[in-house]
């Protein structure tokens, strides 16, 4: 085992009891915590129960619906309630091969189960008999460690890594939850089905460890976990995350405005939820833009101005996105935005210049794979409500 000491950099931590009125009370694009976390009481309780009972869990929803925030909230509550429970989280966003996956998994498990770097070194010596990892760590136990393996060795003996959490849990009398975000990225690995078989063959035998797997590519996650021919079929409790209802958004928005000494009319809060289609990311972003424009009281007119500014702000992104769509895909989107329901009917095909019913099927599948459309039980919807608004009113000019 090789150990490299990383130069320690100062870490400044700040605490606060109350937000100043100059700081926005809305959060998006990062993990929501404490007062930023919105509702999800039932889902949180369900997830905490699964963690405490070591039930494998698969969480599926479109992008930016708050999966990561929900998992972080449930993990925090579960650890607070159970002194023997440890949660380790890894994100596969930038992980594109098995080698990187094994390194990330090892780092995650070691950090979650050791409070001192001496414990990390001890665990490596105890649980890695056939592998010789290279470890880089800081003298500060709160700082990151990094692990590297000889890929030739790992290919021959991946068992030690895949069983590491289970062995540590048995040794220390712990329960461990391994949370893996962007899990669908394993589909990009070499021979992904074989890799999935390897993961399941190990993980299904673990008795002191459970896995929470989630990701932002809904259609890919569905294929991995609901396809009877795939290794992870029926691996655990399958949860489909729903949107937060407008009834829950309204009191949240009013309270967040009130916390900074401002007010928002009920009609304005309703308008934010409607324009954002109750999409968690966009509700928070539109609320923030409305808050910026509010001196004392936010009105529906304030929200309308904020929405127009947000659409304009994102228009260049939407232009680039639409430029990468085919004419047939755009024609299908226009039909959907125009309220057409029988997309393969002769009248709709002719009206919108769609070549054939087969073209509808191909375009629909392509748009789902591009994360533009979502198909829930045959009902098509846009994953991005602001993009849908821009397409309808600015691009197609549908009135």
Question: Whereabouts are the PLM-identified features?
Answer:
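Sensor-1/coupling segment of RecA-like P-loop NTPase cores
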Residues: 170-172, 176-179, 185-191, 197-229, ...
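Amphipathic alpha-helical "lid/sensor" segments that cap RecA-like P-loop NTPase cores
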Residues: 250, 254-316, 377
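Short, conserved phosphate/pyrophosphate- and ester-handling motifs at nucleotide-, phospho-/glycolipid
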Residues: 40, 68, 279, 384
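A short, basic N-terminal segment
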Residues: 1-62, 80-83, 386, 399
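Alpha-helical DNA-recognition elements
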Residues: 77, 289, 366
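Conserved AAA+ ATPase "SRH/arginine-finger" region at the nucleotide-binding site
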Residues: 237-248
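C-terminal leucine-rich, beta-strand-based interaction scaffolds used for sensing/assembly
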Residues: 10, 14-24, 312-399
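P-loop NTPase nucleotide-binding core
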Residues: 62-65, 69-177, 192, 209, ...
């Amino acid at each position: 085992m090789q150990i490299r000491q990383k130069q320690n950099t100062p870490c400044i931590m700040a605490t606060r009891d109350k937000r100043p009125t100059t700081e926005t009370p809305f959060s998006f694009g990062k993990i929501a915590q404490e007062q930023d976390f919105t509702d999800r009481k039932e889902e949180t309780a369900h997830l905490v129960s699964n963690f405490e009972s070591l039930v494998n869990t698969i969480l599926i929803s479109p992008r930016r619906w708050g999966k990561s925030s929900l998992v972080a909230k449930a993990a925090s509550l579960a650890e607070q309630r159970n002194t023997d429970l440890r949660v380790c989280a890894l994100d596969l966003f930038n992980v594109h091969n098995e080698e990187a996956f094994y390194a990330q998994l090892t780092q995650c498990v070691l950090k979650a189960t050791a409070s001192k770097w001496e414990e990390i070194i001890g665990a490596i010596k105890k649980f890695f008999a056939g592998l010789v990892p290279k470890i880089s760590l800081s003298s500060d136990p709160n700082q990151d460690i990094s692990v590297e393996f000889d890929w030739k060795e790992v290919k021959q003996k991946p068992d030690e890594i895949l069983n590491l959490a289970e062995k540590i849990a048995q040794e220390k009398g712990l329960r461990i939850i391994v949370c893996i975000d962007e899990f669908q990225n394993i589909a990009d690995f070499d021979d992904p089905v074989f890799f999935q078989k390897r993961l399941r063959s190990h993980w299904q035998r673990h008795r002191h460890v459970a896995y929470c797997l989630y990701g932002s590519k809904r259609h890919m996650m569905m294929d991995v976990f609901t396809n009877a021919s795939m290794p992870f079929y029926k691996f655990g409790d399958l949860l489909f995350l729903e949107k937060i209802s407008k009834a829950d958004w309204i009191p949240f928005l009013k309270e967040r405005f009130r916390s900074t000494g401002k007010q928002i009319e009920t009609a304005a809060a309703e308008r934010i939820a409607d324009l954002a289609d109750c999409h968690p990311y966009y509700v928070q972003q539109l609320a923030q833009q409305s808050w910026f424009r509010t001196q004392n009281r936010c009105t529906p007119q304030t929200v309308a101005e904020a929405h127009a500014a947000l659409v304009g702000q994102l228009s260049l992104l939407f232009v680039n996105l639409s430029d990468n769509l085919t004419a047939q895909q755009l024609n299908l989107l226009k039909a959907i935005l125009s309220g057409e329901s029988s997309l393969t009917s002769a009248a709709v095909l002719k009206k919108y210049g769609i070549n054939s019913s087969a073209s509808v099927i191909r375009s629909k599948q392509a748009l789902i794979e591009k994360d533009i459309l979502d198909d829930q039980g045959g009902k098509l919807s846009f994953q991005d409500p602001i993009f849908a608004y821009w397409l309808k009113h600015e691009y197609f000019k549908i009135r």
